[in-house]
Amino acid sequence: MSVEVFYDDDADLGLIQGRTVAVIGYGSQGHAHALSLRDSGVDVVIGLPAGSKSRPKAEEQGLRVRTPAEAAAEADIIMILAPDTAQRALYTESIAPHLAAGKALFFGHGFNIRYGLIQPPADVDVAMVAPKGPGHLVRRQYVDGKGVPCLVAVEQDASGNAFGLALAYAKAIGGTRAGAIRTTFTEETETDLFGEQAVLCGGAAALVQTGFEVLTEAGYAPEVAYFECLHELKLIVDLMYEGGIARMRYSISDTAEYGDLSRGPRVIDSQVKERMRAILGEIRSGEFAREWVAEDEAGRPNFAKWRAESAAHPIEETGSKLRGMMSWVDRPITETA
C-alpha cells in the first residue's frame, strides 16, 4: 500500500491508560469511543449539556457524565465528537478556557481544523482518530475482538509524541486491530466531503431519483421503477462492498455487465467528471465550508427547503408503500442484535 498502516504492535496503550479522556458528545461515534476506551482501561468522562437526552443513557452504561466544560477541565485528552456545526461554539465556550498547555485536542473529523473555525493554542497536541464505519459497527467489532480501520492524523505536535498518542487512542477503540492509516486533516476532510457530495449521498441520490423520473415519465409503473432504480441498488452495492467493482461484475449477468460497460460511461461522462472536479475545487478552496457555515448561521433556509422538496419526491411515497410488503426491512439497519 502507498500509505502508512499501523497495527496493534505499533501502538502503546500505556500512553493513554494513565490519562483522562473526555468524550464530548454521546451519539453514534461518542458511545462507541467511550465504551471501548473504558474497556481498554482508560479513565473516561463524558461531556454533555445538563439537559441532554443522552445523559441517562451514558449514566446507565456506567460512565461518568459532566458538562462539556467540566469534562474539558478534568481531562488530559479532549475528543470532540459533536456535530461539525456545533463544534466552534462548543470549543469557544466550554473547551478553550480549560485547554491548558500539555493537553491534547482530538477530533473525529477534520472540518473545523481544516477550515480554521477552531484554532487551538500552540502548546497543545491536535490530532484526529476517525474510524471508517458507523459507531455501532465500531463498538460491535471491538466487543468481538476485532476492529474497524481508522484514519489517524496530527495537525499540531506540541508534545513531540502526538502521533503516538493518537495511535494509542486508535488502539483503545480497536482501530489498530484492523489497521490505522496515516493521513492529514486536509486529506481526510476534503476527500470525506467530496465522497459525500459527489458520490455517496449527493451523486447516488440524484442518480436514483433521476432514473426513477426517466422511467415513470416514460409511462412505466412507479413501483417497478422503484425496484429497478432504488431497491436493487443494495444488491449491487453489497457486492461492491464485499469485493469491489470486479466482484460485482463477476456476479451479475453478462447482459447486465455488457450494459454496464457500454452504457455506464455515457451516463457518467467527461462532462460529469468536470462537474465533479468543480465540486472538489469548491471544497479545497473553502467555498463550500463558507457557504455551509453561513447557511447554518442564517437558520438553514435553503437546507430546509431542499430537504422538504426531496422528501416530497414521488419515489418516497412509492417506496413507503412497497416497503410495507418487505418484512425484512422492518428492523432498523443500525440495530445490531
UniProtKB/Swiss-Prot annotation:
Sequence positions that bind Mg(2+) 1: 192, 196
Biological source species: Salinispora arenicola (strain CNS-205)
Catalytic residues (UniProt): 109
Binding site for NADP(+): 26-29, 52, 54, 84-87, 135
Keyword list, A-Z: Amino-acid biosynthesis, Branched-chain amino acid biosynthesis, Magnesium, Metal-binding, NADP, Oxidoreductase
GO CC, alphabetical: cytosol
Pfam family, one: KARI_N
Record-listed substrate binding positions: 253
Residues holding Mg(2+) 2: 192, 228, 232
Protein name, UniProt field: Ketol-acid reductoisomerase (NADP(+))
Cofactor note: Binds 2 magnesium ions per subunit.
Single biological process term from Gene Ontology: L-valine biosynthetic process
